[in-house]
Amino acid sequence: MASEFGILLTNQIYDQTYEKEMCDVIITAENAVRRVEVAGVHGYEWGATNHRLGLCEVENTKSIGRMIYEQIRCEGAYPIFPHYITDTLKYGKSIDRNDNQIRVDRDDERVRKIKIQPYFGEMYFSPENYITVFCKRQAISGQIEVSRSIIGRRMKYEESAEQTKGTINANKYRLLEKWRDLAYEQIEIERDNERCLTHNTDPIYQLIKKMRYGMMYPVHYMLNDRYKVVQERADMGVEKWLLQKIGRGTQRRKADDGDNDALLQLERMMSSEELERSVIESVIRFGSLYNAHAGKKTGDIPLEVLIKYCDSLTTFVHKKNREGGDNQTARDEIRRAVVKNIPSMKQENQMKVTPNIRNFLFFAYLNGFKRNNGVDIDPNNGTWSKHKAEVKKFLNEEQKKNENKPLKVLIDGAYISTDAEYGTVAHWVDWVVDIVMMTQVSRMIKEYNFIRLKKDQLISGMNKLEDGVKCYAYCLILALYDFHGRDVDGFAQGTRTAAIVETVARMFPDFRSEVSEKFGIDLAVSEESDELFVKKTMVSSFSDSGEMGYKFIFGWRKTDFKVETDYGEIVSDEVHRLYQAILDGKEWSKEVDDPEKYFVDDLYNRCPESIYVRNGVDPNNKIMIKKRGLVGESQRIFLRDLSHIGMNFKKLLLRLSSKRLHARGEHIQYHEIDVEDFKPCAIAELGLHCSTYIYQDLLVGANRGEYVKDAKELVWFDIANTNFNITRPFDRCWPSSCAEAELSLRFHLITKIFTRYRGERTSFVDIINELSEHGYVKHNFPSYKHYYLSVIQTVFEDQRAIDPLDFCAMISRNETRESTLKGFSMFTAIVKSERLIDTLFLNFLLWIVFEMENVDVSAANKRHPLLISHEKGLRLIGVDLFNGALSISTGGWIPYLERICSEEKAQRRLNADELKIKSWFLTYYMNLSLERRAEPRMSFKFEGLTTWIGSNCGGVRDYVVQALPMRKPKPGLLMIIYGDDGDARWVEWAMKNFTAVDGSLGFIYIDRHKLVNKSDFRVREMKIYNRGRLDRLILISSGHYTFGNKFLMSKLLAKTE
């Protein structure tokens, strides 16, 4: 007997309605989000879509970048339409794809069903049929002319006074004019369609996860804001700069730094009120807003104990006020008093005074000083002589530490050059003043039972500080040191200790080293950076007064180098050691080393921000710097192992004039560097320079509901392509266009590189020059799987019809990887071949394995083998798959493939040891297990990404998909799709991967206006009167099929385990 599946469409559930429990699905219009159309974009009132019980979505105003890359915290999330059902039908097994998520729903006791909230209302599902319910989004195709209008709009904006501020960037405008011409040429050859050609979310989704949806530009290595360049050296080369340390963090105000005002107010409070309870509480309150120095340590200092510490420590801060109101230490006053009591003498002369009648008053002063202070300061006696000897020894040691270059050090509260002859009148006066300071402060201090601090240390340290605010700030740190010990960092956020450390660090970034030096205590300084230069990007905070630094620019240029050569003298002995270790059967992970160890080349620096280091100080205590390595300013040097890749070093000077306004009209300022250095990701990853370039994504605008007409990131992407005389297509919206351009460019470059083993041995520079002259074929890959398979088939010259889903599933599994690849006759031939050139062709396995969809590589296991041809034969090197990037990058290994082998050795047969290495290499990659990348965190964001794409084109439609299992006469699956004024043709296209498999029973589309039946079942639409109200009822009759019970899906999946 046939059974029936009932779907009820009603406006509202009004009361206890038990007869409605008989329906399997109820669709109401309650809380439906109103559809709107703005400038041709179909969407919803987006503010009403936040946090509904459907696809987990945060506020519609959150940026798409934050939505994609952040861990969204909410009740749960629906997954993208899952593969595990079709895996069961198609393969008879369950493949772990990690695409399960916690569901967002609620049990409704009124109708005893489970409730969700798609945009078109509220839906209720019977529990037995609910486990296979999923959300789906359609990005609607918009008018293509709207997307193309960006060209004229952009050119007009770049010329506007609002953007240029009276200064036109000539290089940028020239490139934009070239881009405009290329864009119009591209439009001429495209098909004359009115609407966006395609919306394929998967390629964008995969490129985002691989961090390739955008472009790359050189990192800025800017001078650390703790230093500034001495003005007279600013125009010189970097190596000739003299640096001066900036003592206080707030003296150098940063652009867009809103915390400075609060910090300056806090300093004024310290200056006027010292460390009263209210000031201490303000310090803690300010620091608690941040957590840069917070950790997990507990055991906070009690507030009352901290106040008692400060009450004592502030008595060590001995200062007086001048009439003008400025703070000044008592040192100057005491110094003037001492000078009045000595005979008239030149300050630079050695301190010698003969006892006679003329100097009677001076010696009387010395005797009185000895009675009052207990110290003999007579310059003719042993105390002064002993002090001179100790200081001279100290000065000599400090100069030796500074590479025997003179510098100034602090002696008795004054700075003295280490090459000066110590013992002058001025030196004696400073010595006496220091003794007086120590004695007077000692009489004023309040005693406290310190645990670690010593009274003499505190007196001496405070006397060395001339800044009253710094004295008070350091009192707080000294209190923490005495209470906690040497390590005052790492306390949990919210603790007083963490807040105080945060506040003092923002006032005085070098407080750790200075407190240690001045007070002679062992305060931990491990967190304090010693870098002279720090990495910055175009969106970093820059000083309004300008910043200075440098950058590396890499590119390709034709040289005399030929790719048909072997690696020779530039290869280190480590390569031969690794070769022998693998022959001896040793484990790869224990033998492989840093890739730099395999080449004798000191041009490449794995820490480019540290290419300049300290070189001591000059006589005025200005820091001198020196260069490490051979790279010099304005030099272009070609890497010895990659002879077509040139490295150029340039000094940077960024001023306010480099600021630009955001094209989206938000009046957000940003710094823009030399746009001619921009590169598409596909091209940038052909060079080791990836480690000195940074990735800029195209995730701009809100995560849904905002139509981005243009953005600075999109301008940068287009300029990066224009730098190589290429452009993206304009027959689709910009999100899809940029993804298509990146994948098509990658397809072109990778296939050109690997087909060299079977054809002409071209260099990378030839490939890039050919690209710039003739462009590349623009493909339309429906998914990343299609792109992946197309590359492999092109390289292996295979023309079979292969299902991409099947192929990628087989490649991802160790058990079936080798057998799948041996389906390609060319692969089988190179595996059997004993020729050198065919063996080197096996390096394509790195691309096959690491460019799979969703692949993740552990940073602890990031080095893998690559084959090279050496003068002594076939060899191995370890390559780094990350290459300094946040994600897997081909830049860590592709550049080493440019050099192939010498022409006369290409057809050489391998010897026994080399054949053993080849076999080991093949086995390594056939059995290499890899994890899936980021799927548990990102899989549910697939539909959210589709919503963003639609928001930037023709709009969005919301759907709910239900998979209904059948058990007789054989297991099958019926797809039911619910929507609101949806597109049945799009639904048929979206379901094609599921309706095409064996076991599929077709689909039925239902919305409030129509019903489309493309299944093997009879569907009837009827009216039902329910307590005086007219509703709509849809009945699906099973015919000779039998609907599965509530356990059927579990039973189907259980068979595959």
Swiss-Prot record:
Q: Where in the cell is it found?
A: Virion
**Alphabetic keyword roster:** Capsid protein, Inner capsid protein, Virion
The entry lists its GO molecular-function terms as:
structural molecule activity
Query: An example Gene Ontology cellular component term from the record?
Result: viral inner capsid
InterPro entries for this protein = Capsid_VP2_Orbivir
Top-rank taxon of the source lineage equals: Viruses
Q: What is its main location?
A: virion
Quote the function comment for this protein: The VP2 protein is one of the two proteins (with VP5) which constitute the virus particle outer capsid. It is the major target of the host immunogenic response.
Give the family, as the similarity comment puts it: Belongs to the orbivirus VP2 family.
Question: What protein name does the entry list?
Answer: Outer capsid protein VP2
Originating organism: African horse sickness virus 3 (AHSV-3)
